[in-house]
Amino acid sequence: MANTAQARKRARQAVKQNAHNSSQRSTLRTAVKAVRKAIEAGDKAAAAQVFLASVSTIDRIADKKIIHKNKAARHKSRLAAALKALA
């Protein structure tokens, strides 16, 4: 239990930050799923377009340190490899 005013405020802020970060991670997962779905459909043009949008999302979330930069790089690398294999 938070005893000081500062600790109580930090606890309130942590709840808000956790909700925001969870939302951002959900957005990341949705973007990755969209690329996977486009690749499975076999439409290379659509998959490439969705891939570019997802890379932007991944980079933005990594820049905010919601996920680690290496995890972002791993996501982008695996999606790019899957897209390349579609050709």
From Swiss-Prot:
Organism superkingdom: Bacteria
InterPro entries given in the database record: Ribosomal_bS20, Ribosomal_bS20_sf
A Pfam family matched in the record: Ribosomal_S20p
Compositionally biased tracts (Polar residues): 20-29
One annotated GO biological process: translation
Region called Disordered, residue ranges: 1-29
Any Gene Ontology CC annotation: cytosol
Keywords for this protein: Ribonucleoprotein, Ribosomal protein, RNA-binding, rRNA-binding
Example GO molecular function: small ribosomal subunit rRNA binding
Family as reported in the entry's similarity comment: Belongs to the bacterial ribosomal protein bS20 family.
Function: Binds directly to 16S ribosomal RNA.
Protein name from the UniProt record: Small ribosomal subunit protein bS20
Organism: Janthinobacterium sp. (strain Marseille) (Minibacterium massiliensis)
